[in-house]
Amino acid sequence: MFKIIEDKPPQWLLDNIASSTDKLKSNYTLERLKLEQMICFCLLYEDDKIVGFSGLQKFEGNTARVNSRCYITPEYRQYKIRNERVRYPWKYLAPYQIKVAEKLGYTKLFWSTELYKRPEKTMNLTIKYATQYIPEGWQYKRLGHKDINGVKQEVCEILKS
């Protein structure tokens, strides 16, 4: 059974990430997680095992970033389980964070990802998957490439309709 708990990640998990070969491991320290900028920071569990984490980050104006500093543990990174690919951030964390933002009066959110080998294809596949789980009254809208804190990223708006 999956559940979300709002808390900071346990230090043992951050230590495991720091000693791993994860190419983004420098983002996953208490300092670099930017917890002070998070409206909420969510840990996703399956029973008593941590699946991953991400935050809903305050941004410019009345905007917030969904799935900021998202990390999924290696045990849960996969392509298919029982013939279905599970994208934990989009099935569990994003819907939770969108609902938190809605309760606080947000009507415009976004998420972004660094540009990888197949940027548009990856973004489109993620939107298609995430749309299955988006809370009622919200929609995803792909924006293309934007500068986010000095890094060129692919961006998707999440808008209250």
Predicted regions and their residues:
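Short glycine-aromatic motifs
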Residues: F2, M38-I39, I127-Y133, W138-Y140
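Conserved acetyl-CoA-binding loop-helix of GNAT-fold acetyltransferases
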Residues: I72, Q78-A101
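Conserved beta-strand-loop-alpha-helix junction that forms the acyl-donor binding cleft
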Residues: L109-I134
